[in-house]
Amino acid sequence: MATIAQLIRKPRRHKVKKSKSPALQVNLNTLEKKVTSKSSPFKRGVCTRVGTMTPKKPNSALRKYAKVKLTNGMEVLAYIPGEGHNLQEHSVVLIRGGRVKDLPGVRYHIVRGTLDTTGVDKRRQQRSAYGAKRPKADKKK
């Protein structure tokens, strides 16, 4: 335990909290070529690679991911949620934060139903999370 004299000389420091999605905290001023710290909920980017990845130990699957070059100049790995997708190289996508626990290095999700990403076909429940429109049969109500 520190004495009062020690605390007067050198006060306690606050712990610096590290961001779980650092690419969303950075902004790039292209006119002045300066990086500023301004956080945003989403970022736009261009797919540089689309592929599949195998998850960590107890799980087994082929999870779809995309390497995305963001507007702030950073390149990140983003998960493509839902069944089936239309993404390919040079597709423009919107990413949000949120990691995939069993894929190392994947800290972001691609938002379905925006920009070049289509929504999930034949999705009935939790449609807004997958960018799916309301089915025609339900619209009569």
UniProtKB/Swiss-Prot annotation:
GO terms for molecular function: rRNA binding; structural constituent of ribosome; tRNA binding. The keyword rRNA-binding applies. Residues 118-141 are annotated as: Disordered. GO terms for cellular component: small ribosomal subunit. CDD domains: Ribosomal_S12 (cd03368). It holds the Pfam family Ribosom_S12_S23. Keywords: Ribonucleoprotein, Ribosomal protein, RNA-binding, rRNA-binding, tRNA-binding. GO terms for biological process: translation. The keyword Ribonucleoprotein applies. InterPro entries: NA-bd_OB-fold, Ribosomal_uS12, Ribosomal_uS12_bac. Part of the 30S ribosomal subunit. Contacts proteins S8 and S17. May interact with IF1 in the 30S initiation complex. With S4 and S5 plays an important role in translational accuracy. Belongs to the universal ribosomal protein uS12 family. HAMAP family: Ribosomal_uS12_B (MF_00403_B). This is Small ribosomal subunit protein uS12. It comes from Mycoplasmoides gallisepticum (strain R(low / passage 15 / clone 2)).
